[in-house]
């Protein structure tokens, strides 16, 4: 279905007001699976509006007119639409009663003949009641084209759309359903290359990639008449994506860490720690507490996080985590050794199930011969300790610190999932 929005009002063309209704309606129609092809604005002029309606009726299936339903002489939307369709204007009983009630409770207000037009609808139209104002809207289908008239003020338009128009449209149209897959460990351009065939051949469902700092999301969208139908279609596409091999032969499934628009690696780790009844601590150098702050963002963090350490200098690493200073000097603070000893020391001191540690070069200058963006992340549990090295190149200092925490959370997530598989 092709939809078109027509904003009626000279004040829009002269820049006196901003057409926020177009954005609101476009978002709502997209949620219903209705594609908006055109945005049009026309002044308060019958001939020009008739010309626009003639054009719209030839290229769109759904034409929504906003504004021009009031009592003044330049409010001519309903009259012009009725003329275009060759129909009369008639009074809607419910809207007329509301008008009667309005003036009955306001005896000082004079009820003039032009007020009556607010209760009129195009003959044959289904009324759309105005929950916050007096001007009734309407919806009518003629020769395969559906026309909708809505009031201009957003305070009246939005309730009418949400409570009157959307139910009317969803009786006969599909809804847009979406599922968001979240990836870590692959860039947007690389991911798009990997699933190029799926993107090129997409029809319904569709795939839309979005790059975020340190991660990528794929929004899978489909038009369906129910959530169950949508899930069936999205399940098929998701499985195709998961089974696709990366450039180094791995499964894309291994790079998907979760679902949802507002999900995060930090939340996934928090959820898994609670699920398995595990606790974690952290010792941070370059990230200076960023990992710990991310855990503490979630209500109930005290169930999984006992406390942690920010050991920025070599001396504090030695003093707070019981690492021999001579060994730190020998291996350097930017090393596998230091990351592992930090993780192990933090875990032992707090008697936590997991200890995570981050040490490295946030930049912009190099340190100990390591380029900016070089990070060592250690992880310790009650049985073993290990570490990884990552190089986050071409990023700002703040990005290096943030992306480092993502790698740390992903390392913990993988460890927790391995523990789940061993149960």
From Swiss-Prot:
InterPro entries: CinA, CinA-like_C, CinA_C, CinA_KH, Competence-induced_CinA, MoaB/Mog-like_dom_sf, MoaB/Mog_dom
Transmembrane segments: none
SUPFAM superfamilies in alphabetical order: CinA-like, Molybdenum cofactor biosynthesis proteins
Superkingdom, natural source: Bacteria
Family: Belongs to the CinA family.
Name used for this protein in its record: Putative competence-damage inducible protein
Provenance organism: Streptococcus thermophilus (strain ATCC BAA-250 / LMG 18311)
Gene from which the chain derives: cinA
């Amino acid at each position: 279905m092709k939809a078109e929005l027509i904003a009626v009002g000279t004040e829009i063309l002269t820049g006196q007001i901003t057409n926020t209704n177009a954005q609101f309606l476009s978002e709502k129609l997209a949620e219903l699976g209705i594609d908006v092809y055109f945005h049009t604005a026309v002044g308060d002029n019958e001939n020009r509006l008739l010309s626009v309606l003639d054009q719209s009726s030839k290229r769109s299936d759904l034409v929504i007119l906003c504004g021009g339903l009031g009592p003044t002489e330049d409010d001519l939307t309903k009259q012009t639409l009725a003329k275009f369709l060759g129909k009369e204007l008639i009074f809607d009983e419910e809207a007329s009663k509301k008008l009667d009630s309005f003036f009955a409770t306001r005896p000082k207000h004079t009820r003039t003949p032009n007020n009556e037009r607010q209760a009129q609808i195009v003959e044959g139209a289904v009324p759309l009641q105005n929950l916050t104002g007096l001007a009734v809207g309407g919806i009518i289908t003629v020769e395969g084209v559906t026309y909708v008239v809505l009031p201009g003020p957003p305070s009246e338009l939005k309730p009418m759309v949400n409570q009157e128009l959307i139910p009317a449209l969803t009786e006969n149209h599909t809804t847009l359903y979406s599922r968001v897959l979240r990836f870590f460990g692959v860039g947007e351009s690389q991911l798009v290359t990997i699933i190029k065939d799926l993107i090129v051949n997409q029809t319904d469902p569709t795939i839309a990639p979005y790059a975020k700092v340190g991660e990528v999301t794929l929004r899978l969208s489909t038009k369906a008449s129910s959530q169950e139908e949508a899930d069936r279609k999205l399940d098929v596409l998701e499985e195709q994506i998961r089974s696709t091999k990366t450039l180094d032969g791995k499964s894309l499934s291994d790079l998907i860490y979760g679902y949802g628009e507002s999900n995060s690696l930090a939340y996934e780790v928090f959820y898994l720690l609670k699920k398995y009844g595990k606790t974690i601590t952290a010792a941070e150098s370059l990230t200076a507490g960023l990992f710990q702050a991310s855990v503490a963002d979630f209500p109930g963090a005290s169930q999984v996080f006992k406390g942690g350490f920010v050991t920025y200098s070599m001396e504090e690493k030695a003093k707070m985590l019981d690492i021999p200073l001579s060994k730190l000097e020998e291996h350097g603070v930017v090393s596998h050794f230091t990351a592992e000893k930090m993780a192990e020391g933090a875990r032992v001191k707090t008697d936590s199930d997991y200890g995570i540690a981050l040490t490295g070069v946030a930049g912009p200058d190099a340190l100990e011969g390591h380029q900016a963006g070089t990070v060592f992340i250690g992880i310790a549990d009650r049985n073993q300790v290990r570490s990884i090295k990552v190089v986050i190149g071409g990023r700002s200092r703040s990005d290096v610190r943030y992306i480092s925490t993502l790698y740390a959370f992903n390392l913990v997530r993988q460890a927790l999932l391995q523990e789940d598989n061993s149960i």
